Amino acid sequence: MTTWVALLRGVNVNGITIRSADLAELLRGLGFDDVKTILASGNARFTADVDVQGRAELKARIERALRERFDYDAWIVLVTDRELEAATRAYPFDADDDDRQPYVIFCSETAVRDALVDAAASLDPEEDPTHPGFGVVYWSPEKGRTLDTPFGKLLGRAEYKPTTTTRNLRTLVKILGR
């Protein structure tokens, strides 16, 4: 059994509301065990008899079920608990800096992650500090500027919606149960 973490994009914002209990019920209905939802921002941890080679099929299955049940254009990033733990531990910036947000951008496709890393390389590192990680991009924008920095605007492009989602480091710690 593998412990998976589903990170749903765009849940409980822009009119897309999914209650945690409904999300848990959906995942249990798909045959997953040990289902736990964390916070109300589209985070769920569960176990399934699917290893990492089956990730793409598992992702597609969950997205299809979300679309059918909640009638919205569902996108998720699916990581194992070990991958999430590694991404959290490797955060390269000062997570306790009160003036900045400690973000981790998860990418379900390597090409997308690479494109974000390449784009970030041309930006001002003071305004948009980023750092590449395994399957992720770390980002530490000033508080209150998430949507208006060049990197923030880049992340908001429609082309990245199906393959990326951003989480605060504190949320990731809660997902891991620490």
Report the location of each language-model feature:
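Surface-exposed, charge/polar-rich loops and edge strands
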Residues: 2-178
